[in-house]
Regions:
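Macrodomain-like recognition of ADP-ribose-binding/processing modules
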Residues: 1-262
């Protein structure tokens, strides 16, 4: 199948599954088709899919990621401050590494807003709809929302990363408190602990809580670097060899450069 054939097949499958969206015609252009397909991915409730769907979805998503360029996270230049750390600016879904981190919400089901550009939406989109169903099963077994500062692990599905570590960061409403700081540090600690329990060697962190959760970005970066270094120092026999801080905005790149290279 061509990429267009895959997009059309997946759209038709999802529109049959969710007839309330069947009135949306399939655009003729690539961008329009992807916009509609991604929206359908995003609004789809957690549920299993057929093996054929998984195969076609995987072929589509892996081809998209390959065209962006897959980057070996373990081979990124080490920080001048700490050889265990690295900094990278770009789309975290391009990284081939044992695990990338997803800044999730407490329901752990991903972002349902069509084509929203939060990290949760992007990672779940490029992983495939199987990830939402996996998270759903984890949450059903748990029986309650995910606490702030904890973490869960799922397969990376169609991502270059083998696994995704999902963590819920603190929401800052009003003034920043010591409890916010403690919970943010706990996100990093929980992810590293979970990664080590699974014998993972590389972890790439997105910026946690600095978007709609409104954690001040300068302090969040300091907490991230300090917490990761302290955890690695306290666990010298852990499997983790490389931690990557992934940023997207130029301002975040400068923040982390000051912390990691000066």
């Amino acid at each position: 199948m061509t990429q267009e054939e895959r997009r059309r097949w997946l759209i038709c499958y999802l529109q049959r599954e969710m007839p309330e969206y069947a009135h949306y015609g399939i655009p003729n252009d690539e961008a329009g088709q992807w916009h509609l397909l991604r929206a359908l991915f995003n609004v789809r409730p957690p549920a299993p899919v057929t093996q054929k769907f998984q195969r076609i979805e995987g072929e589509l998503l892996k081809t998209i990621t390959a065209a962006k360029g897959i980057v070996n996270g373990m081979a990124l230049p080490a920080s001048g401050l700490d050889s265990r750390l690295a900094l990278w600016q770009d789309d975290i879904t391009r990284l081939r590494i044992d695990a990338i981190v997803n800044a999730a919400n407490s329901q752990m089901l991903g972002c349902f807003l069509p084509n929203h550009n939060c990290i949760d939406n992007i990672e779940q989109t490029m992983a495939g709809v199987e990830m939402r169903y996996d998270c759903y099963k984890l949450m059903q077994a748990q029986g309650h929302d995910e606490p702030t500062g904890k973490a869960k692990i799922t397969s990376g599905y169609h991502l270059p990363a083998r696994f995704v570590l999902h963590t819920v960061g603190p929401i800052v409403q009003g003034s920043l408190t010591d409890e916010h700081r403690r919970l943010l540090a706990s996100c990093y600690e929980s992810c590293l602990t979970l990664a080590a329990e699974h014998g993972l060697k590389g972890v790439a962190f997105c910026c946690i809580s600095t978007g709609v959760f409104r954690f001040p970005k300068d302090e969040a970066a300091h907490i991230a670097v300090r917490t990761v270094r302290h955890w690695l120092d306290a666990h010298p026999d852990a499997s983790i060899e490389r931690v990557v801080f992934d940023v997207f905005e130029d301002a975040d790149l400068l923040r982390y450069e000051r912390l990691l290279y000066t």
